[in-house]
Amino acid sequence: MASATTSDHAKQAGGAHSRQRDSGLLDQLGKLFGQEGSRKVPEKGKEPATRSVLMAPTTHKAHQGARRQTDDSPVVHFFKNMMSPKKAPVQQKAKSGASRAITKFIWGTDGQRAHYGAAGSSKSKDGFRGRRDGSGTLSSFFKMGKKGEGSPARR
């Protein structure tokens, strides 16, 4: 047996050392995250505290890539998200008339909110649906209540 590992020595020794954990995996993880030389075997009473101290910096490093860049302050991040064009929600086929009308009013028929970077709008009031064309909020609600439309219970 030319290359014996720590676990092989523990198996051969037997006795009190047979209960000792194999620290090979922990050593490899420590080397991976830059904690070389930490081969100390934790004591029974202190194991959870030691594990949380060792794991806290690694989980923090792992989640940093998913967060926003550190050069953006929270205020800048907020305004960037507020001013960027929003995508229309995915439309479901089985929507009721009221929710469809509200969605159309909020998002518009072309899927873009009015004045939020809608492409192809030359005038500033092209996306506005108001009293002139009769497709505002109240008009759409009153159109829903016409006879012959809606659920069979209302007719």
UniProtKB/Swiss-Prot annotation:
The modification Phosphoserine is found at S73, S84, S121, S122, S135, S139, S140. The modification Deamidated glutamine is found at Q12. It is a peripheral membrane protein. The keyword Acetylation applies. InterPro entries: Myelin_BP. The modification N-acetylalanine is found at A2. The keyword Acetylation applies. It is found in: Myelin membrane. Its main location: membrane. One of its GO terms (cellular component) is myelin sheath. Keywords: Acetylation, Cell membrane, Citrullination, Hydroxylation, Membrane, Phosphoprotein. Residues 37-49, 123-134 have a biased composition (Basic and acidic residues). PROSITE patterns: MYELIN_MBP (PS00569). Several charge isomers are produced as a result of optional post-translational modifications, such as phosphorylation, deamidation and citrullination. Dogfish MBP contains four major components designated as C1, C2, C3 and C8. C1 and C3, but not C2 are phosphorylated at either Ser-121 or Ser-122; C2 is phosphorylated at 2 or 3 sites among Ser-135, Ser-139 and Ser-140. Hydroxyproline and citrulline are present but were not identified in either C1, C2 or C3, which suggests their presence in C8. GO terms for molecular function: structural constituent of myelin sheath. Residues 1-72, 113-155 are annotated as: Disordered. Belongs to the myelin basic protein family. This protein may function to maintain proper structure of myelin. This is Myelin basic protein. It comes from Squalus acanthias (Spiny dogfish).
